[in-house]
């Protein structure tokens, strides 16, 4: 919808542009053109003055030309017939003696989005590639990519590609970088520009003459080159050494990634590089740019996966500031958890304790969870702080503290006494589902150590009709069933009332079925109840699974200096694929073959110039596979791997299933504990879509565990990675001796 009065404005400007007195005065004429541009940017339709603006391009004033060319690029699609007149003017300016005019005209011509413009811009672009002025060559090189996009699904012009490859030897560094960008765009269907030995060495020698943007770009392209020998590799690393000290964060990160990729067979070199870039990473974490700060923090967490405690001496750099946004604070809290050691634990805990009373409830709860994470190592100090937080009687604080206590007593049974002493009275400040479930679980499992446990549960039973969360009711049923075994006199009556309500009045079928199950279980006998419900109250071995082992640098080196640490590898892979599909959805694959520049790229160097494939396995979380689909797929595949391991004792299904879930392996079906023979069927999927199906079989004598694995895609590296993960989990849970 046009603005009110826009027609009058257009008429006034059109009249002014045609006024010979204004045309004779350069400043007045330019001011009128500026008014046209200003109204155009404000949303007014200024296409009616197109002809007058084309006439205004016939001037020696470069500023005026630039304004007119901006206008032409905007309205050429709306006025294609009149735009042909503009093309004639632009073609004439492409031969102007002034290189600034030639470059400006060529850039504007390549920016015209109108049908049939390709035939007009091809020759000026080719001429521009051979222009004496570097500015014109810069524009012409980028114009090649624009021209290719205008051609759509046509074949790649081999002569043009050869011309661009030869321009990689240009004396102007910006021309070189623009050539790489254009070749990457033109050859994207063929895998992008090929970096062989001559090109790689040429780019390395020209690095010092590039600006910081160009250096970062070239470092990214050099990732595609694989040195042929160790001597060549270390020569390249020596050339890149100075860029680890660059003032530009982008250059430092690009150089670091190149070091990590090239030195994949030399872990000590990778470690040395990560030590040297500690300073730039810390500086980025303190940057005023919030986006840069957040990305740097994600990279710090990535480095800590391979070098725990790498930033421990600089832990204060990760203390939160009041003015920082929420997402940066959360990242810093996560980093602080990984930097705790004997020397700084007191200072870190005091800092986290201050965050627990922050006005932002989410941040306060994250700080409490962080203290709970540290409590696995420094139990006494953390339990004391958490107990003091209960005294604040704040609902959101109490809820998270109780959840932390629940996880803590499961992994650290030595703190059970202190937790049980702190619980009485906290039930008054818990209203949400997660907090209620945690409290009820603690009262049911450790109720014999909590004097008022039956009376707290009785309050929940009395108010069960008004309880809105089915999960709370189910937890309440289980807790009372457990507590009645240790304190029958106090719990028997309320258990009867709860079972009656769940069976006769409850509308949620899951709760009703749980009540019927427990009722029938009681009819069988108290011994059977003890056998089923008296499971272990803690399992410290699960802490080994939560504390992931150090990951080799090579497992994440390819993700460094990308958004993968920010989004997560699996999510970032999905985003990248969606972007590629959206970008190329209207394009057809190119089947063209073209000649390449003889002295820069040769056939024998193509194989060595390809980027090496990553052998890192990443399992996709939350895979949902039905039993029917599993069975159908299992029967259609052959066994890819089978191995037998020594085993001692029975399998604890709950512990094993939880451990497998931590590493993103789904349990399809599993035998109950003590079954003869014992079996389990598992599934997982990697980030490339490859499916892994596994069978665990424990022989009747409980002496051997057989693992059989099938995969949908025959990839040896992925299979070995999956088997390694599976064996690690089973070995941790069952203490396999292989």
Curated annotation (Swiss-Prot):
Pfam families the record matches: Adaptin_N, B2-adapt-app_C
Entries under InterPro entries matching the protein: AP_beta, AP_complex_bsu_1_2_4, ARM-like, ARM-type_fold, B-adaptin_app_sub_C, Clathrin/coatomer_adapt-like_N, TBP_dom_sf
Renumbered residue ranges of the record's region Hinge: 534-600
Top-level lineage group: Eukaryota
One GO location term (cellular component): cytosol
Protein keywords: Golgi apparatus, Membrane, Protein transport, Transport
Region Ear: start-end pairs: 601-738
GO-annotated molecular function: clathrin binding
Protein topology in the membrane: Peripheral membrane protein
Role, per record: Component of the adaptor protein complex 4 (AP-4). Adaptor protein complexes are vesicle coat components involved both in vesicle formation and cargo selection. They control the vesicular transport of proteins in different trafficking pathways. AP-4 forms a non clathrin-associated coat on vesicles departing the trans-Golgi network (TGN) and may be involved in the targeting of proteins from the trans-Golgi network (TGN) to the endosomal-lysosomal system.
PANTHER family xrefs: ADAPTOR COMPLEX SUBUNIT BETA FAMILY MEMBER
Subunit structure and binding partners: Adaptor protein complex 4 (AP-4) is a heterotetramer composed of two large adaptins (epsilon-type subunit AP4E1 and beta-type subunit AP4B1), a medium adaptin (mu-type subunit AP4M1) and a small adaptin (sigma-type AP4S1). Interacts with TEPSIN; this interaction requires the presence of a functional AP-4 complex. Interacts with GRIA2; probably indirect it mediates the somatodendritic localization of GRIA2 in neurons.
Protein name, entry field: AP-4 complex subunit beta-1
């Amino acid at each position: 919808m046009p603005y009110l009065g826009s027609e009058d404005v257009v008429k006034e400007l059109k009249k002014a542009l045609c006024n010979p007195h204004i045309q004779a005065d350069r400043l007045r004429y330019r001011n009128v053109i500026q008014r046209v541009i200003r109204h155009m940017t404000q949303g007014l339709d200024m296409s009616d003055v197109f002809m007058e603006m084309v006439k205004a391009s016939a001037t020696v004033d470069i500023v005026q030309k630039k304004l007119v060319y901006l206008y032409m690029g905007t309205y050429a699609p709306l006025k294609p017939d009149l735009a042909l007149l503009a093309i004639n003017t632009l073609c004439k300016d492409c031969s102007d003696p002034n290189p600034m005019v030639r470059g400006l005209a060529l850039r504007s011509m390549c920016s015209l989005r109108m049908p049939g413009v390709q035939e007009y811009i091809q020759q000026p672009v080719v001429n521009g590639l051979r222009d004496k002025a570097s500015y014109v060559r810069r524009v012409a090189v980028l114009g090649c990519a624009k021209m290719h996009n205008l051609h759509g699904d046509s074949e790649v012009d081999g002569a043009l590609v050869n011309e661009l490859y030869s321009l990689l030897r240009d004396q102007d560094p910006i021309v070189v970088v623009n050539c790489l960008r254009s070749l990457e765009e033109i050859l994207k269907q063929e895998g992008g520009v090929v970096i062989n030995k001559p090109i790689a060495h040429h780019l390395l020698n020209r690095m010092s003459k590039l600006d910081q943007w160009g250096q970062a770009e070239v470092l990214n392209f050099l990732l595609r080159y694989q040195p042929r020998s160790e001597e060549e590799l270390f020569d390249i690393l020596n050339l890149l050494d100075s860029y680890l000290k660059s003032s530009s964060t982008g250059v430092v990160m690009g150089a670091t990634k190149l070091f990590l990729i090239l030195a994949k067979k030399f872990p000590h070199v990778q470690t040395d590089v990560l030590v040297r870039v500690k300073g730039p990473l810390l500086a980025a974490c303190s940057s005023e740019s919030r986006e840069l700060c957040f990305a740097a923090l994600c990279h710090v967490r990535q480095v800590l996966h391979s070098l725990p405690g790498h930033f421990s001496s600089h832990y204060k750099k990760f203390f939160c500031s009041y003015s920082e946004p929420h997402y940066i604070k959360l990242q810093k809290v996560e980093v602080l958890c990984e930097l705790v050691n004997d020397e700084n634990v007191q200072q870190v805990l005091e800092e986290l304790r201050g965050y627990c009373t922050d006005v932002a409830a989410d941040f306060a709860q994250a700080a409490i969870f962080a203290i709970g994470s540290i409590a696995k190592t420094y139990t006494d100090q953390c339990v004391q702080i958490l107990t003091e937080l209960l005294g604040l009687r704040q609902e959101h604080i109490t809820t998270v503290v109780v959840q932390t206590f629940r996880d803590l007593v499961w992994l650290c049974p030595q703190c059970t006494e202190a937790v049980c002493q702190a619980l009485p009275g906290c039930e008054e400040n818990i209203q949400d589902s997660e907090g209620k479930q945690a409290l009820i679980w603690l009262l049911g499992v450790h109720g014999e150590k909590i004097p008022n446990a039956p009376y707290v549960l009785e309050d929940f039973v009395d108010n069960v009709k008004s309880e809105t969360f089915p999960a709370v009711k189910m937890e309440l049923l289980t807790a009372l069933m457990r507590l009645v075994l240790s304190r029958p006199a106090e719990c028997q009556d309320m258990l009867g009332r709860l079972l009656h309500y769940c069976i006769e009045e409850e509308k949620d079928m899951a709760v009703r079925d749980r009540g019927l199950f427990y009722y029938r279980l009681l009819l069988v006998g108290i011994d059977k109840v003890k056998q089923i419900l008296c499971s272990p109250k803690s399992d410290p071995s699960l802490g080994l699974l939560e504390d992931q082992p150090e990951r080799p640098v090579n497992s994440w080196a390819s993700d460094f200096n990308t958004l993968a640490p920010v989004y997560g590898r699996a999510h970032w892979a999905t985003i990248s694929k969606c972007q590629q599909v959206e970008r190329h959805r209207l394009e057809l694959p190119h089947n063209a073959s073209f000649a390449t520049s003889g002295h820069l790229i040769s056939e024998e160097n193509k194989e060595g110039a390809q980027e090496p494939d990553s052998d890192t396995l990443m399992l996709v979380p939350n895979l949902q596979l039905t039993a029917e689909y599993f069975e159908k797929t299992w029967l259609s595949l052959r066994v890819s791997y089978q191995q037998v391991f020594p085993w001692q004792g029975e399998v604890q299904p709950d512990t094993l299933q939880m451990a497998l879930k931590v590493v993103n392996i789904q349990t399809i079906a599993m035998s109950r504990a003590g079954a003869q023979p014992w079996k389990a069927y598992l599934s997982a999927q990697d980030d490339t879509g490859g499916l892994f199906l596994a069978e665990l079989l424990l022989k009747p004598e409980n002496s051997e565990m057989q693992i059989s694995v099938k995969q949908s895609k025959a990839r040896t590296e992925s299979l070995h990675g999956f088997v390694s993960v599976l064996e690690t989990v089973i070995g941790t849970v069952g203490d396999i001796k292989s």
